Amino acid sequence: MYSDLQQPGSFSRKIVRYLRNNKTHSLHKPVRKHFKRRRIITHYPGQIIQMDLIDLQKFSGSNSGNRWILVVLDSFSKKLWMRALKRKEGVETADAIRSIFHDMDYPVQSVIFDEGKEFLNSSVNMLFAQFNIHSYHIRTKIKAGAVERVNKTIKNIIWKLFTETGKHRWIDSLNDIQDNYNNTYHRTIKMTPNQVTRENRKKVFKNMFPEIDDRINCRLQKGDNVRVALNKETFDKSYKVNWSEDIFTIEKVFQRLNVCWYRLKDQSGNIYPKGKYFYQLNKV
């Protein structure tokens, strides 16, 4: 490895090859957690909506017993609907979602949410079946990003309201907050959420995804052998093994919107349908 010190490029490439082939280094290599992931691609209002809850339990005494805000976001138009909840039980959550569906100007095709019991219950499932809606719940630690960002925006507005009024009452302002959000210019769609319709959806799509046809060079290729990052809890020791003992082979490479992801197969030829990103793989 050290025989060609006059050629720095050659020297660095040899180090990379050595480290890739060194099992100890390969297993303990740090895992990068924050990186660019695939975006949700939608083509019209109602195609995909996201749901989440804002936890305001500690202010329930000032808000007539209301403890939560149900947040529903249309991924295409960025339009927002909110409902106050006293309990996050199945029946109350389903009733709130139903009232939002009735307020919408278009049918909903798919819903995305996390694994909270407020959404994973028979009452909500029956509601989705009634409206012929496909539902998907997120099993990873990466939540539905768009609605998470909206939650932060809404909480920021509510906390400013607390400061301005000197009180912790938000329930009376919920509709005004919703209307203000939906009439505010959104830089992604280059208009307000209330201005988005099915008639101008092509313009909105072009504003959202101008780079949809761009091509990039993916850093891993079909046939490369890799280890897979282990799912570790927040407080797991960083010096423990970070990568799988088993070695997988990249079976297919995908890319869209300047993001690459990879489908893997194990040494027995079994294909794993769920894709992995570059930073979740460690080439060996």
Each language-model region and where it sits:
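Retroviral integrase
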Residues: 8-156, 187-284
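Short, charged, surface-exposed loops that flank catalytic or proteolytic processing sites
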Residues: 162-176
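Generic recognition of well-ordered alpha-helical segments
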Residues: 153, 157, 176-180
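DNA-recognition alpha helix
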Residues: 1-6
